[in-house]
């Protein structure tokens, strides 16, 4: 699935909520801290990681690509 952003970047925890992959910010924080989220194919535990156009995020079998 593609997620279009209108800003230069979106933070990882915000993307998970925006794409409806998690229900709350607390849930986003938990799944990121547990190493359940991949950014560009690598596990990422930084919830404030800035994602830019072209980045991909995978969680729970779903992949999201950032577009602009």
Regions found by a protein language model. Give the residues of each.
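A basic, amphipathic helix-loop patch mediating RNA/tRNA/ribosome contacts
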Residues: 7-50
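Short, charged beta-turn/beta-strand-edge "cap" motif at the junction between a beta-strand
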Residues: 61-66
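Absolute protein N-terminus
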Residues: 1-2, 68
């Amino acid at each position: 699935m593609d997620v279009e952003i209108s800003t230069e970047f979106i933070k990882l925890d915000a993307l998970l909520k925006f794409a409806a992959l998690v229900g709350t910010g607390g849930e986003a924080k938990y799944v990121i801290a547990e190493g359940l989220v991949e950014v560009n194919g690598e596990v990422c535990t930084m919830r404030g990681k800035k994602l830019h156009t072209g980045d991909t995020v995978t969680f729970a079998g779903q992949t999201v690509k950032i577009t602009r």
